[in-house]
Amino acid sequence: MTGRTMHETDPTDTTDTGRVTDTTDTVRVTDTTDTVRAADVIGTAGATSETLSGTEGATAGKAASGTAAMRGEARAPDATGAGARVLRAAAVAATLPYLALKTAWLAGSDIGIPEGSVLLDPGVFFTVANAVTMAMDAAVIVLALLLTRPWGRRVPAPLLLVPAFTATGLLTPILACFPAQLALRAVGLGADPAARAAGESFLDGWVYLVVYGGFTVQGLALTGLFVPYARRRWGSVWQGASGVRLPSPTGVAAGAAAALGTALGVLYAYWAFGGTAGLGAERAALHSAETGVVSAVHAVCALLAGWCAVLLARGGARRPVRPLVAGWTGSAATLCWGLYLLVAALAPGTGEGGNTPAVILLAYAGQVVTGCLAAAVLTAFATRRRIPA
């Protein structure tokens, strides 16, 4: 963990074995047989005065002062800049419309649900899905606080990186697709009225605008908060060269991710540019420039996931920052959206049921596998670089 060094003056502490005095960030330890001068104060809260003896005592003093620094940093007042506070407020505010809708639906309201929609009689699956997605959006509030409050710096890395990876995966395609779809509609290239009416038989049109507009703000705000946080805490992971090649099993996983990612990229690119083979009659009839944008984003994410995994596994003299960022984004989006679409296609009562073409189901499953393989390579790379906990 990185942090600023803060200078504090500790009181004089006299014990049976020596005297420790700290007035200018210098710890002087006097013993009957040995004298240790320690001027390396680790952390941001100053040094901890202890009676030390010999070289082992000096080492223990450094560890103790580092621990005290972490605790002091967590107790420090919020020094977040004005920009970060604005982004935090935006992220929190952007969750409110979605949380309000989910709360209303769980309470039995039919706001935003048209006549004839399957959501009017949700059943167990939709009830559980509403509760889970509501909890996930509420987690955005916790994540925004964690990225901006002092206590967030001592949260173990996995407890932060897993929800951050999930948020990246779910929000990245929305950030790419939603503005593009609005632009296509504005210039008259959006979906035809029949396709739009089919979408509005599930939810009213305004619900999509409110929900995806909120997700867009959340994605932008969390990106603005996570990037500087990651730079401060884990900047060492992408400094210097990529290094030596990762072990053989990791290389095999990267190669498999690249092969699957390439196949998915070709398939989704074909659909993006107007191809309809494998979509089934219903989806082929609803194909438009808007659905083409979605397919194009899936293609790019799958390719990034696979080939960035290869670059990280191969190592070398190049800096890893670009493949690491692109691989993180691509693998997260490929895994999370592949899993979401697969569950939605197979879940009972969603209107999909057994009508989803096998090619589409295989594509969704391929996204999940590709994302998992690429994420495993990223984890191996970061572990080798000794990512701080």
Predicted regions span which residues?
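Membrane-interfacial, low-structure loops and terminal tails that flank and connect transmembrane helices
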Residues: 61, 66-84, 232-252, 389
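Alpha-helical transmembrane segments of multi-pass integral membrane proteins
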Residues: 91-104, 166-177, 212-221, 249-273, ...
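C-terminal transmembrane-bundle signature of multipass membrane proteins
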Residues: 99-105, 265-275, 292-389
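Membrane interfacial helix motifs at helix-loop boundaries and amphipathic/re-entrant anchors
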Residues: 102-133, 177-212, 268-297, 340-367
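Membrane-water interface of alpha-helical transmembrane segments
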Residues: 78-92, 120-130, 154-164, 201-212, ...
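Intrinsically disordered, low-complexity terminal tails and inter-domain linkers enriched
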Residues: 1-81
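Transmembrane-helix bundle segments that line or gate the permeation/cavity pathway
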Residues: 2-8, 80, 84, 88-114, ...
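Cytosolic juxtamembrane helix at the C-terminal end of the final transmembrane segment
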Residues: 148-152, 223-244, 309-322, 378-389
